[in-house]
Amino acid sequence: MINKLSLLLFSMLRYTLFYRRFSIAVSILFLSCCCTRIYSQQLINSSSSDQVRLETTESKIESILSLMTLKEKVSMCHAQSQFSSPGIPRLGIPELWMSDGPHGIRAEINWSNWDYSGWTNDYITAFPALTCLSATFNPDLSNQYGTSIGEEARYRKKDVLLGPGINIYRTPLNGRNFEYMGEDPYLASIMVVPYIKGVQMNGVAACVKHFALNNQELWRGHINVEVSDRALYEIYLPAFYAAVKQGEAWSIMGSYNQFRGQHCSHHKLLLNKILKTDWSFDGVVISDWGGTHSTKEAALNGLDIEMGSPINNETSPRHAYDANFLGTSFLELVKSGEIDERILNDKVRRILRLIMRTTLDSSRPLGKINNIEHSQVARKVATEAVSYTHLRAHE
């Protein structure tokens, strides 16, 4: 009798435990399905929202483009001052303001010369150079760095930050190696992506430079670089590829040097083929300052905005740049039909897209300047770089 009672109790207990476990399992499965469905729906909604936003932006761009005169379109393709390009006031299109540099926002420069303006409120955080950042081997810290410098650029009302620089070290004698992320294409590729995302979350475009093969400063405006396709794709381009495909950079700066006999700021292979076609880059190509040498090549080979000093200083400051390569001479070539207006329209679409992403984005934050958080990021970068370098030296 006792054995039967014990067996009955044991069976009831086992059934209860099984039932509870079964109930819990069913509940977990149900919740999992619900959560998966909710999460999937969130992803769908997010994707749909992004698609709607994209379609709205592109629709606005086409509407604006249809209202612009030929002269207005061309005016957006060149500078109006040392660090800005014009907008179209009658259509509510603002100017684009740019600034150096990769490790600190440059003090204000005069409108039409390279003298400093003497402002007293343009102080910033001086961050360690990008070589130091790269030496931390810390992508999260790279994102903090980019976010901080993006906040300072935004506070100073800059729309395009002229950086980061990711040219690969080819020679230790390059005077700007300190600005770049090292000699390792893989490391530079890993570190540049979070930097770009940090900058651009502030509604400020990262302008990744110098595209491409700008690996020495001596005679940089004239030197003709010759490298094999293998070296080009395996050493000199991977960091730029990561910047475009993973970092989704909004702008790229062409370099001063030539590559296989053609200047890189209007290079058919680098800009039209590799960057805009193979990599599907939808942003703006900006020349290095004074890096443009031909109206036809600039128009046909992928340059969108020509920057630099005015060729003609005799006219009023606001029209001094009309004499530059993508100014009046470009306008005349389009008017004559020698250059198809569709080529001009593609440039203007890209510029308008950049403006939509930056200065016309009403949701972008106001920015911050020279605060304790930025100083802490700068100090952490310097500390981690020195510590890691010291440890590696004693391995």
Go through the PLM ranges and name each one.
Residues 41-392:
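Glycoside hydrolase catalytic-domain context in secreted enzymes
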